[in-house]
Curated annotation (Swiss-Prot):
Enzymatic reactions: dTMP + ATP = dTDP + ADP
Protein name: Thymidylate kinase
Gene name for this UniProt entry: tmk
Species for this entry: Rickettsia bellii (strain RML369-C)
Keywords assigned: ATP-binding, Kinase, Nucleotide biosynthesis, Nucleotide-binding, Transferase
InterPro entries found in the cross-reference section: P-loop_NTPase, Thymidylate_kin-like_dom, Thymidylate_kin_CS, Thymidylate_kinase
Residue sites binding ATP per the record: 14-21
Family from the record: Belongs to the thymidylate kinase family.
Length: 206
């Protein structure tokens, strides 16, 4: 029996160049093909306002606290205008990044920043956390090679291997901190179709 029910909130997490967005799209297309109500969205972004904030965040050098607050403001708009209404209407919501990315990308830049991110979410955001998070685990050396081979880039893409390792270690740590929510998919040696099948298997869709 599928683990999915109406109003399930699924997020995909990990660093740059790991195929996370591809897996979001593949799961979205599969659920649509099964006539399951589903929407696909992303962070930072997902609404007109949040997408404008995204452009600032990914292409502008901001102070660490400014960057964190920008991400949180975009999330509030996204949650209130899109995610929560979709869940209340019975949709599965697939989100490409959510709070764990904020913890790793913005929280690491601040003293006790990871704890601060989750506390701010608890205190300021609507009371919602993902039901399930897939961490796409790809080694940093592979991820940075993939990023270097593509034309699109933002300020996070072009940082060096040390940055990629730091982000990778952060997500690994979060997967151990929240094992009841975060499922690790080891994907370094797998193609996108194989990763997709593992995700479907975990959701009891096959």
């Amino acid at each position: 029996m599928s683990k999915l029910k109406q109003g399930t909130f699924i997020t995909f997490e990990g660093g740059e160049g790991i195929g996370k967005s591809t897996q979001c799209q593949m799961l979205y297309e599969y659920l649509k093909s099964q006539n399951i109500p589903v929407i696909l969205t992303r962070e930072v972004g997902g609404t007109n306002v949040a997408e404008k904030m995204r452009e600032i965040l990914v292409h502008t050098d901001l102070l660490p606290m400014s960057e964190l607050l920008q991400a949180m403001a975009a999330r509030y708009d996204h949650m209130v205008k899109k995610i929560i209404p979709a869940l209340q209407a019975g949709n599965i919501v697939i989100c490409d990044r959510f709070i764990d990315s904020t913890a790793c990308y913005q929280g690491l830049e601040l003293e006790n920043g990871i704890e601060l991110v989750y506390n701010l979410h608890k205190d300021l955001m609507p009371p919602l956390m993902p039901d399930l998070t897939f961490f796409i685990d790809v080694e940093s050396s592979i991820a940075i090679e993939r990023v270097n081979s593509r034309n699109m880039s933002n300020k996070f893409d072009v940082r060096g291997l040390d940055f990629y390792n730091k982000i990778y270690d952060c997500f690994k740590g979060l997967s151990k901190k929240f094992p009841e929510r975060i499922v690790t998919i080891k994907a370094s040696d797998l193609n996108p179709e194989q990763v997709h099948e593992l995700i479907k298997k975990h959701l009891n869709l096959i």
